[in-house]
Amino acid sequence: MGALRPQPPRMPAGHVAPAYWQKRGLAAWALWPLAQLYRALVAARRGLYRAGWLKAQHPGRPVIVVGNVIAGGAGKTPVVIALARHLQARGLRVGVIARGHGRSRRDCRAVLPDSPASAVGDEPALIARHFANGPAVPVFVARRRISAARALLAAHPDTDVLLCDDGLQHLALRRDLEICVFNDQGLGNGFLQPAGPLREPWPRSVDFVLHAGAAPGGSPAPAFGVQRSLAPCALRSDGAAVPLARLQGQPLHALAAVARPGEFFAMLQARGLTLAHTEALPDHYDLQRWERMTDPRLTLICTEKDAVKLWPLHPDALAVPLVLHIDPGFFAALDAWLPARRAMPEIAPGSDAAAIIAGTEPTLPENHRPMDPKLLQLLVCPVTKGPLRYDRAAQELISRSARLAYPVRDGIPVLLENEARPLTDEELEQ
């Protein structure tokens, strides 16, 4: 089955996406047949999951995936950090899982604030540093996200919710909520790779859309705007803040090993900074191999993501954090989703609830009795381990995460997948 996993071509190392990804010119149309082959592979893989030939696994806690459908940087990691802080403010214990792109190891491990980015990946290292002081947010990386989730929950069993940094296309991890992030280039020319920037066809089903530019069309999901700006101060490796205004007039060497380095350089210049030299490197570039070729008297300035790799060898570098301003309506919508998704209480082995979940119904008394409301609080969807909603009129237990409705017969819920019916899109929107 692994042969059917689509492998899109990588972006040109270290520089902006091809210009033909933004318009449907000759180059894009020439690659269009390959894009159709890629489309077929994507559809075939998704079909294998829908048919049950490939199994998606759920870790037993609500999973929120923050991802994108375009190649290159969309600003997912700052969204994950903002989400983690928001969920903490709501009293939830948050964990973060990721693959750790660009790291030298393929094992499953915890990410600490001082973990080398080369071993855990630059984005996970950045997230761990953000939560070094204050309420802890455990971060785990693994090639398989489900392995990272299980390791995190084994080490931190009190975790209420998991955030997955990237992984919208990682269908092996069953999720409860999907957030798709777009940068200001949107859908580009709308073609799939390699003719365009899309990793999969759009529109696709997601729960929320966050967009830095115009809202992408075609999706019924609620869309909310995002504004990105540079923080007013750069940071030294020791945590000291340096106001950007103080750097005006100084010649700077700006370095960026991100998907869209030109955007970072433009934001620096918009702050009135003088860039004597700009250097764009491949995204996730191993900066341990980087050698400074410019005048060492130039102040070295970089992105916050690059700093976690640059500071061990160049502690004099300044890092400029990115500040994210998300439409408050998004957090209001997220808060409305949260109450029913809190971690469910443990179910005692041998109890009626455990028997029902296992699919062995307890013996009913001869007289009819309604379903005990207390029992509902103990039940979870057997497929996703997510919460259930009782539809009294239809006598069904609704699982939005699994898109299934389980029957309730004589007051007893029958949580068997082969007894459930699929929910329609219209029912999911209600």
Swiss-Prot record:
Q: Where is this region: Tetraacyldisaccharide 4'-kinase?
A: 1-370
Q: Which reaction does it catalyse?
A: a lipid A disaccharide + ATP = a lipid IVA + ADP + H(+)
InterPro entries (UniProt xref): LpxK, P-loop_NTPase, Trm112-like
Q: Where is this region: UPF0434?
A: 371-396
Provide the E.C. number(s) assigned to this enzyme. 2.7.1.130
Alphabetized, the UniProt keywords read: ATP-binding, Kinase, Lipid A biosynthesis, Lipid biosynthesis, Lipid metabolism, Nucleotide-binding, Transferase
Name the positions where ATP binds: I70, A71, G72, G73, A74, G75, K76, T77
GO MF entry, a single one: tetraacyldisaccharide 4'-kinase activity
Q: Which Pfam families match?
A: LpxK, Trm112p
User: What's an example Gene Ontology biological process for this entry?
Assistant: lipopolysaccharide core region biosynthetic process
Output the superkingdom of the source species.
Bacteria
Q: Which family does it belong to?
A: In the N-terminal section; belongs to the LpxK family.
What is the documented function of this protein?
Transfers the gamma-phosphate of ATP to the 4'-position of a tetraacyldisaccharide 1-phosphate intermediate (termed DS-1-P) to form tetraacyldisaccharide 1,4'-bis-phosphate (lipid IVA).
Q: What is this protein called?
A: Tetraacyldisaccharide 4'-kinase
Which organism was this protein described from?
Verminephrobacter eiseniae (strain EF01-2)
